[in-house]
Amino acid sequence: FCAGIGLEHPDITNASRAIKETEKKDCASNGINPIEYMIGYDGITFSNSKGSEQLSLTKEEIFKAVSAKVMSNGMIVDNNFKTWSDINPSLPTIEIDVLAPPPSSGTRDAFVELVMHDTCKKIYNMSKKDYKASCSALREDGAVTEAGENDNLIIEKLSANKDRFGRFGCSFLDQKKEM
């Protein structure tokens, strides 16, 4: 995107998020003036298998399950929540296991902004600089696994493990209601 002009570079691309300021700067440095045009909206789901226990999770509970860092006794610490009931005793004692899109994914960007940053701002009352630094990284201890961009594969993995959660767009989920 915006690497240059000519046959070897695309004239049109699409994304599931707005153009970032850093991308606009990259475009400008390559002599390109990007035109952003919104075609529609989608949503993000946090889903598990149809045959699984259906949990009613808050954004705060999801944040606490997937964020690399959480607040404990007024300090930002590594996330040590192992089960959903560690986060909220009313949730079942099942291991936290979440499939996440890769860092290159617009779905991940949207999730980080709409769930992680938004929740972190509210529950920890942090400045933008602080919450972006402390609340952007996903866990790397096995509770969260990058699953790639293939939503069909994520569906297969959710079907194979009833306790696992995954994220993808609402429009994709709508097409896969039977799963």
Predicted regions located by residue number:
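Flexible loop/hinge segments at secondary-structure junctions
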Residues: 2-179
